[in-house]
Structure formats: structure tokens, C-alpha cells
Amino acid sequence: MSAPEILLARHGETEWSRDLRHTGRTDVPLTERGREQAAALRPRLAEREFTRALTSPLARARETCELAGLGDRAELRPELVELDYGDAEGMTTDQLRERYPGWTIWTHPTPSAETFDEVEARLNPLIAELQQTDGDVAIFAHGHILRVLAALWIGLPPQGGSRLALATGKLSALGWERETQVIRAWNT
């Protein structure tokens, strides 16, 4: 028997993701293209048996989970909600750099934004839970939170997620190489 995998699914496209606006807690719906991306995950996920499906409570992740065929077993997990961008919510990187020269989400938190220490604190209990899984788990969530989750999974600090580009409607896989936690596939 092979070791369990944790499949990460980023939600499909939204108007804000398409327009490169930072979308944290604002509950923006999927576009038609986003719904198509989510539905395209269904045959890929149907090849596997998942013991659990976890999803962010935000509508774009829940709808992606539903269209991908796992909505009937989805567990809403608040720790999977996207980062709270504070004053950066709804803004583009270019707009933020006008205000904060050299700004990146990974290096320059904006006022009232969630810190990476806070993000790590909410993800660590979930990671401990996933380390004990005895079957494949599907997780439906958001770009930055999934990138941070993957970085923490392989022992990097949260900001290590800056090295892991993740497009909408894509799958990634976390797992083990013997006893070592690894990224088995990314952004496929």
C-alpha cells in the first residue's frame, strides 16, 4: 500500500483573481471560466478514493469542491480561509507598490493584515492532523494559504510559499518519501 497523499486544489478563477486583486476574506464567486476549471478537476479526482475532503468556508472554495465532485463529503475548515490581507484586500500589487515601494505579500505586511506567525499558528494543528491521516485527503482552498501550507509541510517558514506559484483550478500533492514530508506534485 502506498503512503497517503494530501491533494491541494486551488479554487477556480474569480473576477478578482483574474484581475490580479488580492482576494482574502471577500467572498467573491467563481467566474464561468472558474466553474469550468473546477469541473475539470472532477475526472482527475474521480480516479482516487478520498477518506476526507476539507474546504475553506468561502464560497469560491466550496463551489470548486462541489463541482469537482467531493461536495457531498466536504468538511468546512475555518483554518483554510485565505490570508487576511488587511488594507491590501481588493488591491493589485501595482496599487500597493504605489503606497509601499517594493511591497510583496511575503515581505511587507500591510496595516491590519494577518501576520505569517498567525497563519502558521492556525495551520500547524491541521498539519499535525494530516500527518496522522490513513488515507488520501483532498483540500480545497486559496492560493496563498495553500502555498504556506505546502511550505510548512516541507519544513520551510511560511514565506517559503513565495517560491511556489499556484494557478487557479490547479492541483498539487503533498506526501511522504519514506519518513520525509515532500511535495509530490505542484501546480498541475
Segment roles from a protein language model:
Residues M1-P4, L83-Q95, A151-T188:
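Acidic, low-complexity terminal tails and accessory targeting/binding regions
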Residues A3, A39-Y100, T104:
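Phosphate-coordination/substrate-recognition cap region in phosphate-metabolizing enzymes
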Residues I6, D134-F140:
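Residue-level preference for the first positions of well-ordered beta-strands
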Residues I6-T64, P111-N124:
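Loop-to-helix element that buttresses phosphate recognition and phosphoryl-transfer chemistry
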Residues A46-E49, L130-G135:
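Glycine-rich phosphate-binding loop signature in dinucleotide/nucleotide-binding domains
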Residues S56-L58, E79, F140-H144, W186:
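Short, well-ordered beta-to-alpha junction loops that form the rim of enzyme active sites
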Residues E98-E118:
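Short glycine/proline- and acidic residue-enriched helix-loop micro-motifs
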Residues G143-R147, E177:
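GST superfamily/GST-like fold recognition
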